[in-house]
Amino acid sequence: MKYILVLLGLVASVIAQTCSSNVLSCHWSGKVDSCCSPKYGLVVLNLQWSPGYGPSDEFTIHGLWPDTCEGRYAPRNGCDRSRITNSIGPILRSSNGTLYNRMNTFWPSNKGNNNIFWSHEWNKHGTCVSTLRPSCYGSSYVKYQEIIDYFNKVVDLRDQYDVYGALSLNGVLPGNTYNVNTFLDAIQSYLGARPMLHCDRSGTLTDVALYFYVKGRDNYVITNSLNSGSCRGAVYFPEK
């Protein structure tokens, strides 16, 4: 058994060293190791606009969700029950205090418990990022490294793709109502891809979803959404 574990570690190390950084998820033919390119290769960054939560001039995070290349969901109960945990908050606080603080600011639960929210997102979605399986790290793996890497990537993507900045630079400001195409065009002109918008039944903006393919293991490349979402006509952008 010890020999087998050592062999598996060596294989994982070789994979980590030989992955091509040019492979784009959902765009390759043949076989590519799922440590090198995500099995669920169309990834959705869902951002929330929830009055009372997060900074008044920032969208906050709902989650980063791996989907199939056709846009279907990954398994609803996650992809690896052995890595399910209800302690994401304590893990982050003890492992990376800076990340923990960023998440409290930009990834708050609108139901009151950040740890439960983050743990749900990890268990359902984070465990489905195949390139973050512990075996993909080889001998360099440190316990919880994949959790830190997942949440770091999500927060970094939120910072990099500044939806509020895209809207404000195009004159789309909270407290006003605009046509849905005004939102779509403003975000596309700034970020380079068409987003998906979600509204509640009253026509109030609640979420903006950005779609990505992944180049190599973790280089996210924005792409157009598969559909425009649930917003129609006049959309109200509430103040926080």
What is the predicted role of each segment?
Residues 1-18:
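Fungal secretory targeting signals
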Residues 2, 9, 56, 222-224:
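Exposed boundary/loop context
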Residues 3-8, 40-45, 189, 208:
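Intrinsic-disorder/low-complexity peptide segments enriched for small residues
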Residues 5-8, 37, 114, 202:
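A generic structural signal for short, solvent-exposed coil/turn residues
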Residues 16, 23, 32-33, 119, ...:
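Disulfide-stabilized extracellular ectodomain repeats and their linkers
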